[in-house]
Regions:
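Extracellular parallel beta-helix/beta-solenoid repeat domains
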Residues: 1-233
Length: 233
């Protein structure tokens, strides 16, 4: 995305340009590059990048499970493809405890899918609790020279395990954290443990005045329900 303007039409006297996120990327691969864009008047995050954790609801045989999209605003698309690498995720701790390769995918309904793997389902898997994350469909992200203003939520929400660069941007009075790094498996089910993020040369003006984790301008906030100091996520 180069020089894209997400904002009310000039002269329209409107304050809002979107009722939710403006640029929302879910389950992508490759590289997402957003350069010299302008965001104003979003009612949710101007930029949101993440994967999706699907809950394991049934074990069909030693290699096959039934998975379910859990959030009512995120379902009905192809989340897995033959040959993809996946991780089994403990929902309470957000830890990846096993991996496998997808052998076949069968869509059952808009909310459920049957997936077969190249190895046995982990014995420690907890049905109706743990999730499966697609590791293959995770993008690199580069956001540069952008301007974020007049949003009641975050400026940039980032959840991907691949390299992320957020540089030379201006965040002006975002209501919550200007940059939020977060993942969960029991709420929005937005997946992707973050491993490599560079945030540099950005300008933050009056951000996080109305909320966000501890009103932090840059917030790292994994939503794991169980916290273990010996095994941080």
């Amino acid at each position: 995305m180069d020089r894209v303007k997400c904002m009310p039409r000039e002269g329209s006297d409107r304050l809002l340009a979107a009722s939710a996120d403006m640029m929302h990327y879910s389950g992508c691969s490759g590289k997402i590059r957003i350069d010299s864009c302008y965001f104003a008047g979003a009612q949710d995050d101007p930029i949101n990048v993440h994967g999706t954790n699907l809950r394991v609801v049934e074990k069909l045989d030693e290699h096959t499970v039934k998975l379910r999209f859990m959030h009512g605003q995120s379902y009905g698309y192809n989340a897995y493809f033959e040959g993809d690498t996946v991780a089994f995720v403990r929902a309470s701790t957000m830890e990846r405890f096993a991996s496998a390769c997808v052998v076949s995918v069968k869509r059952l309904t808009d909310r459920t899918v049957e997936v077969a793997f190249d190895r046995d389902i982990p014995k420690e898997l907890e049905l109706n609790h743990d999730c499966v994350e697609n590791i293959s469909c995770t993008p690199e992200v580069e956001i540069r020279n952008c301007y974020f203003t007049r949003t009641s939520t975050r400026g940039t929400l980032m959840t991907t395990p691949r390299k992320v660069v957020i540089a030379d941007n201006t965040y002006y009075k975002t209501g919550m954290s200007a940059i939020l790094i977060e993942g969960d498996a029991e709420g929005w089910y937005e997946s992707g443990p973050v491993n490599d993020v560079l945030i540099q040369n950005n300008i933050f003006i009056g951000c996080a005045y109305s909320g966000g984790p501890e009103n932090a301008v840059i917030a790292l906030h994994p939503s794991n329900m169980v916290v273990d100091a010996e095994r941080p996520v």
